[in-house]
Amino acid sequence: MSKQQPTQFINPETPGYVGFANLPNQVHRKSVKKGFEFTLMVVGESGLGKSTLINSLFLTDLYPERVIPGAAEKIERTVQIEASTVEIEERGVKLRLTVVDTPGYGDAINCRDCFKTIISYIDEQFERYLHDESGLNRRHIIDNRVHCCFYFISPFGHGLKPLDVAFMKAIHNKVNIVPVIAKADTLTLKERERLKKRILDEIEEHNIKIYHLPDAESDEDEDFKEQTRLLKASIPFSVVGSNQLIEAKGKKVRGRLYPWGVVEVENPEHNDFLKLRTMLITHMQDLQEVTQDLHYENFRSERLKRGGRKVENEDMNKDQILLEKEAELRRMQEMIARMQAQMQMQMQGGDGDGGSLGHHV
């Protein structure tokens, strides 16, 4: 008697259906189970509202115990690296978010060396990932590479400062830079547009590479294409952050209350906060891919080239040492051979003298 075939493996309604179409669902389930990792760096002068904006973006308090330094402490203050990691879960999707803050940037009178600490940190994360990737246990690598850098630009100037230009050029081949105009509520709409245009012109003039959003695919829906167009047109993003809930038009909103009215953080007519958050969420995967395929690969290639030359030099040094030792051994062997020959000649001469003396006796 033949066994009955399990009905769950029979699909009579769609003959010829193999099931490859289910692969994206498998990838999705695996990704959701594993969770996602993202590292965001924020850089800018003190007082531009970096911490407030980050707390507003992710609806959390990443800096509950921060102490604001006084003016005297800022004069000789050096750049520090403060990494805060939080686990965020939304509808079953887990995100391990690391925010790297850089307090002290631009505060000291002499900012000549303020880049070094930040650049060293970025390179150290690349180096750590390269080391882990080259190890035996590669299944559980924690990705601490910096995937995006929000660079905060002061709204009180007339464009980029020399410090802004120098810093962005120092890191633009290492990380995705997203320029952000801080405290946009200090500017009128016309002032904001003029400042944006001036910053973009200076970025192009100095050949600074910022993160460019990829074009929408031709098969994307029109709403997504329009969203992408609006996001691109908003760079650099002019933003307002606030941790306070205030009442506006009968509802509680995050915002700032002024004598002349209310600035709502999440109102796209007031600032680009929602656009910045939308860009970060919808392009998080692309930011990671650009980090992996461009910035990390550049670092890895340069690192392996330097490592190759280093090994080559070490091998040359070893060969040179071996040659020198072989030459030294040959010299010692020749010296010993000469000494043996001299001793043999002396012994032969001594035997002759002894014989004649005996003969005379």
Swiss-Prot record:
Region feature (G1 motif): 44-51
Location of the protein in the cell: Cytoplasm; Cytoplasm, Cytoskeleton; Cytoplasm, Cytoskeleton, Spindle; Cleavage furrow
Region described as Important for dimerization: 260-270
Protein keywords: Acetylation, Cell cycle, Cell division, Cell membrane, Cell projection, Cilium, Cytoplasm, Cytoskeleton, Differentiation, Flagellum, GTP-binding, Membrane, Mitosis, Nucleotide-binding, Phosphoprotein, Spermatogenesis
Residues carrying the site annotation Important for dimerization: F156
Pfam families found in the cross-reference section: Septin
Taxonomic superkingdom: Eukaryota
GO MF assignments: GTP binding
Residue(s) carrying Phosphotyrosine: Y17, Y211
Keyword Ribosomal protein: no
Modified residue annotations for N6-acetyllysine: K190
GO biological process: cell differentiation; cell division; cilium assembly; smoothened signaling pathway; spermatogenesis
Region (G4 motif): 182-185
Modified residues (Phosphoserine): S218
Main localization (coarse): cytoplasm
Residues holding GTP: 44-51, 78, 104, 183-191, 241, 256
Stretches assigned to the Septin-type G domain: 34-306
GO cellular component entries: cell cortex; ciliary membrane; cleavage furrow; cytoplasm; midbody; motile cilium; spindle
Residue span of region G3 motif: 101-104
Leftover remarks: Coordinated expression with SEPTIN6 and SEPTIN7.
Subunit organization: Septins polymerize into heterooligomeric protein complexes that form filaments, and associate with cellular membranes, actin filaments and microtubules. GTPase activity is required for filament formation. Filaments are assembled from asymmetrical heterotrimers, composed of SEPTIN2, SEPTIN6 and SEPTIN7 that associate head-to-head to form a hexameric unit. Interaction between SEPTIN2 and SEPTIN7 seems indirect. Interacts with SEPTIN5. Interaction with SEPTIN4 not detected. Interacts with SEPTIN9.
Family: Belongs to the TRAFAC class TrmE-Era-EngA-EngB-Septin-like GTPase superfamily. Septin GTPase family.
Task of the protein: Filament-forming cytoskeletal GTPase. Forms a filamentous structure with SEPTIN12, SEPTIN6, SEPTIN2 and probably SEPTIN4 at the sperm annulus which is required for the structural integrity and motility of the sperm tail during postmeiotic differentiation. Required for normal organization of the actin cytoskeleton. Plays a role in the biogenesis of polarized columnar-shaped epithelium by maintaining polyglutamylated microtubules, thus facilitating efficient vesicle transport, and by impeding MAP4 binding to tubulin. Required for the progression through mitosis.
The protein, known as: Septin-2
Protein's gene: SEPTIN2
